[in-house]
Amino acid sequence: MGCSTGQEAVTIALCLENALDGMQVYQVFGSDFHQQSLSDATLGEYDNAQKPFIPAVYHQYLKDVGRDKFALIPTMKSQLQFFSKNLVDAQQSIPLEAGQCQMIVCNNVLIYFRQFEQRDIVRYLARYLADDGVLLLGAGESLGFSDPDLQQIAVPTIYGYCKTVAPDWLKAVANIAR
């Protein structure tokens, strides 16, 4: 949520591709309210000046495209889908089913909303979490309220919440974050 021009969604896709080594199917969704950001995310081309900040292990998934730009290779780009979402409009439909998501990342987004809107957004996002799914929020986004459907879990440097017990796969994510 709040994907801007897609860099975080691309980062998640790179990490998943590398960790899963093509052994499992995944889909990464990104949403934003700003249409130009969504257009840029969908295009998926980034300045070569950003490439040195991407660990070399992921360069195999990148290709040069045109003048001073790079993008994901087509097989990886097909794993990304971007859509428009106004987080305060719970009635706006999105291309996801309830309980579909193993992980929802909402990093540095809630800080722009009032507490009652944050509560409503978190409850909205929780509908899309699988029973063993995890909601990850930015380091500055501690919820100033409790939600009966979510419990906080220990994840270094960020705030994590789940519906039930923390899933086993989260241990690998927590180790990456250290």
Feature map (PLM): residue ranges:
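Conserved beta-strand signature within the Rossmann-like core of class I S-adenosyl-L-methionine
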Residues: D131-A139
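Short conserved AdoMet
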Residues: D21, Y46, A130
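Conserved SAM-binding loop of SAM-dependent methyltransferases across substrates and taxa
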Residues: T5-G22
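Short strand-turn motif at the edge of the Rossmann-like AdoMet-binding core
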Residues: V109, G138-E141
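Short, well-ordered alpha-helices that flank and scaffold nucleotide-derived cofactor binding pockets
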Residues: L14-N18, L43, R127
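Core SAM-dependent methyltransferase catalytic element
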Residues: M103, G144-R178
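Extended basic-aromatic, gly/pro-enriched interface segments that bind polyanionic ligands
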Residues: M1, Q24-V105, V109-E117
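A short glycine-rich, Lys/Arg-flanked "PGG" loop and its adjoining helix->strand segment in the class I
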Residues: R119-D131
